[in-house]
Amino acid sequence: MANPKNEKRLKNRFLVWFGGTFGPSLLRFFYNTNKWEFKDRYHFKDAVSSGRPIIIASWHNALLTVFMGLSKNNYYGLAGNHHPDAEIISRIGAKLGWKVVRGSSTDGGKKAYNEILEILRSKDAVFAITPDGPQGPAKIPKPGAIRAAQRTGAIIVPVAGQSSKRWGFTNWDTFYLAKPFGTITLMFGKPLSFSEESSFEDCSNALKKSLDQLEERVNQHVGLVSDN
């Protein structure tokens, strides 16, 4: 009789191999066959011009759009630690030009957080984080990005993205994958700065409000009813 644990382990190994090997080419096809629009990118350029480190924040459901729209820039990104999907993201990210830090709030979080702080102490660092990832709850910021910004003086630039043609996969959120031959819009929001004296509740509310409003705008732009 087959051992279910061994079967799951073999399945996970196959998925990691398949995703890491073919994922970059598949994502390039899905996303590079779309027309791209970048809205209000001056917000990001202004943040870069400030000389301070930057945290790019987006909801988890838009991860792939932000991931592909900002690839090839040698930016940093955060993936989970020991989950197969995190390993796939890490391998794909490396091939697409991202420098991936492994860890999450529940798995290797302290080590990853300290590494993020070290990276953000470099003034030219750009680090992408999904504040509600990797396991939700959806659209509720966890402390990591906010605390890191407070500790290092990093500017948080909210970003939302959506495609006019897409698939949606519902789990704890609705995770979007662009279909080929549509139009993808990546929209940047007004940068946020949080002092160390600011309460987490106030910072969290400000970040959530910004990301929710940005998501609603980009969804309206591509003709998608917001799932807020």
Per-range role (PLM):
Residues A2-R28, K45, S71-Y75, K95, ...:
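Non-catalytic C-terminal accessory region of glycerolipid acyltransferases
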Residues R28-P53, A62-T65:
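A short, well-structured juxtamembrane/interface segment
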Residues W36-F38, V100, L186:
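Generic structural signal for residues in well-ordered beta-strands
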Residues K39-R41, G80, G103-T106, G189, ...:
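Conserved beta-strand termini and adjacent loop/short-helix elements that scaffold enzyme active sites
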Residues D40-Y42, H60, S104, G133, ...:
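Short, well-ordered turn and helix-capping elements at secondary-structure junctions
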Residues R52-D107:
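Catalytic core of membrane glycerolipid acyltransferases/transacylases, capturing the structured
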